[in-house]
Amino acid sequence: LPAHARDTLTLGLIPAEDQRAIMTEAQPLIDRLEPALGMDVKAFVATDYNGVIEAMRAKKLDVAFFGPFSYVLAAQLAGAEAFAIAPLGKAGASYKSIIIARKDRGIRTVADLKGRTFAFVDPSSTSGHLFPKAGLLKAGFDPDTHFGRVIFSGGHDASAIAVQHGKVDAAAIADGLLDVAIERGAVKKDEVTVVWTSEAIPGAPFAMRRDLPPELKKRIAAAFATLKDVPWGKQVMPRFEPVTDNAYDVVRDTARLLNLDLKKMK
C-alpha cells in the first residue's frame, strides 16, 4: 500500500552527520509534524546520500530533507519537488561551504593544498563536494590531480574530526556544521583555520514526491507552514518558508561547470 493509505508519512533524512545524531535532531520535528498532519511520521536515514534518493525513487518515502545537490539529483531521478525551507542559524535560508585545515599544517591558501590529503563528505554533498570542487577549479587547482590523496568521509562531522586528529590535512564542510563540531567539543576552534569560503548556497529543502495525491501534497505543505521554532540539534528552525525548484538552478549550473552528468550520478 502507498504510505498515505496507512495514515503514516515516511520522512527521509540524508546522513549529513552520524545517523544516530540525525535521528535525534529530527525527533522534535517529527513530534510537531504528527499532530499538524494528523498522521504518524516514520523517519528513515540512509547510509549515504544516494540511499535517500533511491528510497524516494522506489516510492518508499513521501517527503525527504535533502541537501541542495542531492535534491537536484532527486528532482531528476526520483520525481522530488521542493516545497519548504527552514532558515537555520545566522545565514538564514542560505549557507556556505568552507575548506578547513589544522593550523599546524602550514596551509593558508588553496595553492598550499597541493600534494596534501583531503576529505570530501559524499559525492552527492553540496557543501562537502560540489561547491568546493567547483571553487578549487575556479582557483586553478585541479582536485582530481593536485591532491596527494582524497577520501570521502561520509559525514561533515567525520570530516571535521579527521582534520582535528590529523587523519587528513584539510576538508570541505558546511560552515554551520563546523560550528556544531566546535560546540560538541569534537574540534578545537583555535587549532583549525578556514582556507576558503564559497559564495552563498541556497539552503537544504524539504521535498515531496511529485506523484503523491494532490490532497496529501496540500496537507503536507500546510502542516509544515504551521510549524514554528522547531529545535534541530543545537539550532532552531524558526519557521518553514515556501521554496520552488528554480531556487536550485545555481546548483544545477555548478554541476554543469564540473561536467557532472546528473543522469550518471546514481
Predicted regions and their residues:
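Extracytoplasmic small-molecule ligand-binding "clamshell" domains
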Residues: R6-V72
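Flexible hinge/capping segments at coil-to-helix
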Residues: A101-D122
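A ligand-binding cleft/hinge motif common to bilobed small-molecule-binding domains
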Residues: P68-L77, P132, L137-K138, Q164, ...
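Ligand-binding cleft/hinge of the Venus flytrap
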Residues: L29-G38, G128-I151, D179-V187, L257-D261
